[in-house]
């Protein structure tokens, strides 16, 4: 997942296995690895079509060029039938138009006059051309790479909303314990880190926010040691490769999700070969 999340370092498997999980930590890992949690993340993302998407200001020279409130206004100003993918693409187009207009205005400001006062006419023309290009390239990349979305803030907001979507008591988790876990997650994110238990839901949420539909060209997927995967991870793989026929190998008696859930989930995955 590291290439998918360049700004976040995910806990490795070896780090995970050296941790001795107490019963409380195990409960948190169990809920985050469940099929119910996968559905809860999906439901949360669906809600983002109407409200609560988190945005970041588009900056230039330390100043706000396009405020996040304006981005929110654009994003939620489209037809209510738009899905997250439509909203993302249409907002990008609108931001590019605004950016082009604002840069032309910016290049006529006093700081530009001061910078070019001792230059020749040709040098001034070159300064304007290169200056606009340089600004546009940086901000266009900010827009095209979806950096105006705030995945960390969004992920934390999702965790805070989770008790409204999912009955955590079913997993033996109190609201107080969940609040403590959110605090720990925020602490990790501030250090640029993410627990292995959070990695799948973080990537899945980002994929939903950015309208990814999965790789439809992959037709066959072989997964060994399937008992080491959580139900969430398998459901996420199904989302990521929607047309793939799954062949799962491993010992289902040792699966980290329940036997009943595993059979149901494997059935949904359309697995043609399950060895247990």
State what each model feature region is.
Residues 2-11, 207-220, 227-276:
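Conserved helicase motor core of SF1/SF2 NTP-dependent helicases
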Residues 2-46, 50:
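P-loop NTPase motor core
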Residues 9, 18, 31-34, 83, ...:
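Alpha-helix initiation/capping motif
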Residues 22, 26, 100-104, 241, ...:
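Hydrophobic/aromatic-lined pockets within catalytic cores
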Residues 27-30, 34, 54, 101-108, ...:
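Intrinsically disordered or highly flexible coil/loop and linker segments, enriched in small
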Residues 29-39, 178-183, 206-209, 232-243:
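Charged, low-complexity, helix/coiled-coil-prone segments
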Residues 38-47, 182-188, 242-251:
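Short charge-dense sequence patches
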Residues 44, 48-220, 233-234:
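Conserved helicase NTPase catalytic core signature
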């Amino acid at each position: 997942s590291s290439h998918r999340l360049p700004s976040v370092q995910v806990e490795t498997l070896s780090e995970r296995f050296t941790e001795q999980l107490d019963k409380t930590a195990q409960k948190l890992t169990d809920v985050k690895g469940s099929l119910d949690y996968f559905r809860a993340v999906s439901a949360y993302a669906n809600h983002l079509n109407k409200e609560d998407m988190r945005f970041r200001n588009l900056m230039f020279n330390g100043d706000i060029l396009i405020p996040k409130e304006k981005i929110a206004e654009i994003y939620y100003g489209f037809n209510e039938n738009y899905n997250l993918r439509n909203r993302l693409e249409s907002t990008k187009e609108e931001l590019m138009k605004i950016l082009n207009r604002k840069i032309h205005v910016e290049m006529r400001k006093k700081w530009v006059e001061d910078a070019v006062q001792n230059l020749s006419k040709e040098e001034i023309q070159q300064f304007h051309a290169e200056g606009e290009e340089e600004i546009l390239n940086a901000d266009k990349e900010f827009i095209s790479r979806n950096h105006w979305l705030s995945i960390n803030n969004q992920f934390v907001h999702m965790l805070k909303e989770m008790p409204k979507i999912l009955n955590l008591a079913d997993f033996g988790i109190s609201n107080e314990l969940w609040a403590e876990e959110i605090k720990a997650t925020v602490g990790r994110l501030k250090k640029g880190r993410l627990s292995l238990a959070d990695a799948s839901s973080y990537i899945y949420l980002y994929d939903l926010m950015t309208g990814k539909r999965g790789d439809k060209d992959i037709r066959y997927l072989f997964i060994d040691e399937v008992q080491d995967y959580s139900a969430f991870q398998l459901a996420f793989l199904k989302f990521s490769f929607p047309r793939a026929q799954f062949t799962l190998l491993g010992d289902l008696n040792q699966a980290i999700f329940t036997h009943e859930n595993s059979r149901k989930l494997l059935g949904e995955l359309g697995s043609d070969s399950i060895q247990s």
